[in-house]
């Protein structure tokens, strides 16, 4: 019975539809306190970085920045933390650059290093964090605090991931207003979010049923894989991380083309539970349908298709499990990453409950500071 396998990841997923609109409002209030019209008007380059899930939040915000900064002469780029710290070229006086480092805790050494490097090069630095008093929050010129409400069993952090994305989405609209002189962009996005949030909430029980059925069917898999293209690739990386954190399973991430170059030859070929993400009106739909059909017909895999339409309507010719995911209209498709990770996270949560594995292997070595040096690694400001 599904109710016997309720789990912390599932409870976080179900709370997200309550959290999302509230988190938007909290982010907006926090950002306006930083006086963006005065502090951000000169910005022409926005660099957003972070470690782990925080980088993925940055990657998932690319499209919303692209939408709201179009025609302003300002551009956004999302880069991984080690690149921002050690490899990314910065001018000696990059005063027109806003460097944003994301960390919910604000504690990682690499985040502090990035902020110090940004200051050395004349950037305006911002910490997007849930802890303004942290090392990141006190190192940055600006502490953009998410103020995410407390929640029981909040690890691993789906809520902090949503909060980081929401903070960036709000920043994109406000910066768009500042740079373009337009008004109402933030209000427009808030209204679209509210509408999409309602559609997603109405479908959540059905997605939960689909996720439980898929987890049961895939329970004995040797490993897992997420196949997704375009912006949803980062969603796949997030789901992969959840499997590692909650059940300790390896979960690879691949796009529909590279699957046939590499991952299709992983052995045993039928041993990997697979979650495929598809959107019916996007240009890669046909290729995704071909890949999904091949995963089942040629490799014998158990496959869950997460899409906005039944698999047969996408062109899938093989029998698969299905999870219907509402998607926003094309002009606001950039909202999809705020929720797309939920079906895969539900499957990971149920899988972990079914095999009775403690999250993070019960602690132990994962939290040993002599092994996990995220907060103590040497800082080198280049």
How does the language model describe each region?
Residues 41-193, 270-273, 277-330, 346:
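Glycine-rich phosphate-binding loops that contact phosphosugars or nucleotide phosphates
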């Amino acid at each position: 019975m599904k109710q016997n396998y309720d789990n912390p990841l599932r409870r976080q997923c179900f709370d997200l539809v309550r959290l999302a609109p509230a988190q938007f409002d909290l982010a907006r209030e926090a950002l306006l306190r930083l006086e963006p019209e005065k502090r951000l008007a000169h910005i022409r380059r926005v660099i957003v970085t972070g470690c782990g899930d925080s980088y993925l939040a940055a990657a998932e915000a690319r499209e919303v920045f692209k939408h709201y900064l179009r025609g302003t002469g300002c551009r956004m780029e999302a880069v991984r933390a080690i690149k921002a710290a050690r490899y990314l070229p910065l001018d000696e006086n990059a005063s027109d650059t806003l460097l944003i480092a994301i960390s919910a805790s604000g504690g990682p050494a690499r985040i502090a290093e990035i902020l110090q490097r940004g200051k050395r090069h004349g950037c305006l630095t911002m910490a997007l964090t849930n802890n303004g008093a942290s090392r990141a929050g006190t190192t940055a010129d600006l502490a953009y605090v998410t103020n995410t409400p407390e929640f029981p069993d909040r690890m691993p952090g789906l809520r902090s991931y949503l909060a980081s994305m929401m903070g960036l989405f709000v920043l994109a609209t406000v910066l768009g207003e500042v740079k373009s002189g337009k008004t109402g962009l933030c209000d427009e996005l808030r209204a679209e979010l509210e509408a999409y949030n309602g559609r997603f909430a109405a479908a959540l029980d059905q997605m939960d049923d689909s996720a439980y059925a898929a987890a049961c069917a895939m329970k004995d898999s040797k490993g897992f894989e997420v196949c997704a293209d375009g912006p949803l690739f980062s969603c796949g990386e997030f789901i992969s991380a959840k499997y590692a954190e909650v059940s300790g399973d390896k979960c690879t991430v691949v796009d529909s083309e590279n699957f046939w170059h590499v991952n299709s030859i992983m052995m045993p070929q039928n041993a990997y539970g697979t979650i495929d993400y598809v959107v019916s009106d996007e240009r890669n739909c046909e290729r995704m349908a071909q890949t999904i059909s091949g995963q089942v017909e040629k490799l014998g895999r158990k496959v869950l298709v997460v899409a906005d339409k039944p698999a047969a309507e996408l062109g899938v010719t093989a029998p698969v499990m299905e999870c219907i995911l509402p998607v926003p209209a094309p002009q606001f498709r950039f909202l999809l990453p705020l929720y797309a990770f939920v079906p895969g996270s539900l499957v990971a949560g149920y899988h972990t409950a079914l095999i009775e594995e403690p999250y993070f292997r019960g602690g132990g070595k994962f939290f040993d500071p002599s092994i996990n040096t995220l907060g103590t690694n040497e800082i080198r400001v280049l």
